Amino acid sequence: MEDPSEEAEQPSGDPGMGMDSVEAGDTTPPTKRKSKFSALGKIFKPWKWRKKKSSDKFKETSEVLERKISMRKPREELVKRGVLLEDPEQDGEDSGKLSHAALKNGHTTPIGSARSSSPVLVEEEPERSLRNLTPEEESKKRLGSTGSQPNSEAEPGPEHAPKQPLLPPKRPLSSSCEAKEVPAGSTARSVSSTSGSTTVTSAATTAATDMTKTVKSFVGPTPAPAPAPRTLPAAPASANTAATTTAPAKQPPIPPPKPAQRNSNPIIAELSQAMNSGTVLSKPSPPLPPKRGIPSTSIPSLEPAASFTTKTANDQREKTVSLCLEPPLIIPPSSPSPPLPTHIPPEPPRSPLVPAKTFQIVPEVEFSSSSDLFQDISQQEDQKTEVPKKIQDQSFGESHIPSRLPPLPLHIRIQQALTSPLPVTPPLEGTHRAHSLLFENSDSFSEDTGTLGRTRSLPITIEMLKVPDDEEEEQTCPFVEDVTSTSATPSLPLCLREEEKESDSDSEGPIKYRDEEEDDDDDESHQSALANRVKRKDTLAMKLSSRPSEPETNLNSWPRKSKEEWNEIRHQIGNTLIRRLSQRPTAEELEQRNILQPKNEADRQAEKREIKRRLTRKLSQRPTVAELLARKILRFNEYVEVTDAHDYDRRADKPWTKLTPADKAAIRKELNEFKSSEMEVHVDSKHFTRYHRP
């Protein structure tokens, strides 16, 4: 069995792929330590069996990924079409890296970053991805703290971090190695050309910068990368390196990361802890635009990105939304502290797209795997923006989506609500249902307005869930078009609507993203426990809601019947009892039949005394034997002699069981004396007398 870490460490010798070797320092344990798992796998057979078992899923994922990668267009064609910017400096330097990165494991890989090479490894083995991403995650975070030397302002203190944007040190390592020769003004451009093979349209990159403000208010100083491969909410944080996230959009799901508190930067550690539940800023990278209220001129390294995005931000807003089909990037309230959301939980299983009742903004970078889709989707979006704008205004302004959209199952919506760290606000209608408590529309996105002349950040709100019995209530409630949404997400409901319709035609762009999402049903392995628990509760709640409550049952059935019929029932019972009692004999009859005794207790006692007296008299007046002989009642023969004898007690002095040996000897002695002297025996038979031994 090949050690996963060996393949992961192959590119470490290259300048662009040296993520694993460069960062094996104090804060991040070296990648070499994973080699012990290979020896363990050779000895411990269940380990080997476990990895073989997961290879089936890996094969399926590989086939899907290769099919999707085959749809990509080569870098040259994208440069010709103007999708990618061509930078001669980067081309010269990246030529050496392309030879290693482009054919990693037979897959075309984004050239611009070492991160893009290791996600491709993740495509090859799901288990390997967990190990590779952890060192990368640590190395990327270390870049944020140590690799920021090219720019003097790149590393603000952790306490000042919320006020300053993330700077180019966050970009992929391959470009950070080159950044030392490239002036700060061209960092954004160099990064975008480095990641050129990821095939992102200019519309996607500019739209990504629109969302960078949102990302920064969420991520704080350092968008800490976490290992979940597909979820890239903060990836678009940089306008021009949004393309570096190609592989993660197709990676198999990875279990939550090992805690990355080893990082030297405390805020990085805090953010990595916040991310480790599954949503990954998988490729948070180069320069983020400045925070609210900070002019772009304050940080020279960000000027190119800021100026580039401000021009086309308004034009490309509508094209951004077609790429919003990934886990939710929630915009916390405008407080500048970075660790506002405690975590970004993993995306829910089976419906990672934009589920009903939730709006999720996710980087365009997600879809660099099929780069040709970006222009097609953007063209479709330009044609379809009218209807989506109306839908988006309604859906963001209203606390619920129009009821014509089929609702997703409650347990999936609960998971998506758990995924978002939005504060729970009390429901508008005042009901205390769990779904309305969990899912409430938040107006905090209105606070998150941007500067630099750009439009507001993309608002992401969690809509109220509807359990089946609430659809009727919502139909009765008038739907008020409260147009409070920003114009940054005009086409967002279009993606939602397309997903809700679940049209499977390959001609529509977002449907291919749905294929990617379907590939990620593997995420159920990590969230199955929560999903099953919520699903069980949801099913039970639905069943119980269909049953009438006890008060209703009592009011509907039993009391109404009893009021009218209880008297009749009582009469029937009474008549039956009366009829049975009437058949009983009267007291006189019972007395005559000696069944019922007379009630007079004195008479009864007198009768008893009379009976006793008669019996006593009869016994006391018994005649003697002489009287009976005289009255001829007793007749004896002549030879019978009647003698008077005194009464004696035949009982012994003590019971025979209590006789001692001395008592027995005395009895024998007395008996012998009687037989020898007192007992009259015929002389001829005297010798037959038997005596007891003394």
UniProtKB/Swiss-Prot annotation:
Residues 184-209, 231-249 have a biased composition (Low complexity). Pfam families: RPEL. The keyword Transmembrane does not apply. One of its GO terms (biological process) is neural tube closure. One of its GO terms (molecular function) is protein phosphatase activator activity. Keywords: Actin-binding, Cell projection, Cytoplasm, Developmental protein, Neurogenesis, Phosphoprotein, Protein phosphatase inhibitor, Repeat. The modification Phosphothreonine is found at residue 425. Residues 1-354, 375-405, 467-562, 589-608 are annotated as: Disordered. Residues 55-84, 381-392 have a biased composition (Basic and acidic residues). It is found in: Cytoplasm; Cell projection, Lamellipodium. Residues 546-559 have a biased composition (Polar residues). Its main location: cytoplasm. The modification Phosphoserine is found at residues 116, 118, 129, 145, 264, 285, 335, 337, 420, 436, 446, 457, 503, 505, 549, 582, 620. Disruption phenotype: Neural tube and eye defects in embryos followed by death. By 9.25 dpc, mutant embryos show failure to close the cranial neural tube. About 15% of homozygous mutant embryos exhibit severe exencephaly, along with a wavy spinal neural tube and a shortened anterior/posterior body axis, and die around 10.5 dpc. Remaining embryos exhibit complete exencephaly from the forebrain to hindbrain. Most embryos die by 14.5 dpc, but a few survive to birth and die shortly thereafter. Embryos also have eye defects: they display overgrowth of the neural retina and retinal pigment epithelium. GO terms for cellular component: cytoplasm; lamellipodium. Gene3D superfamilies: 6.10.140.1750, 6.10.140.2130. Residues 250-259, 329-352 have a biased composition (Pro residues). Signal peptide: none annotated. RPEL repeats lie at residues 63-88, 575-600, 613-638. Residues 45-54 have a biased composition (Basic residues). Binds PPP1CA and actin. Belongs to the phosphatase and actin regulator family. Regulator of protein phosphatase 1 (PP1) required for neural tube and optic fissure closure, and enteric neural crest cell (ENCCs) migration during development. Acts as an activator of PP1 by interacting with PPP1CA and preventing phosphorylation of PPP1CA at 'Thr-320'. During neural tube closure, localizes to the ventral neural tube and activates PP1, leading to down-regulate cell proliferation within cranial neural tissue and the neural retina. This is Phosphatase and actin regulator 4. It comes from Mus musculus. The gene is Phactr4.
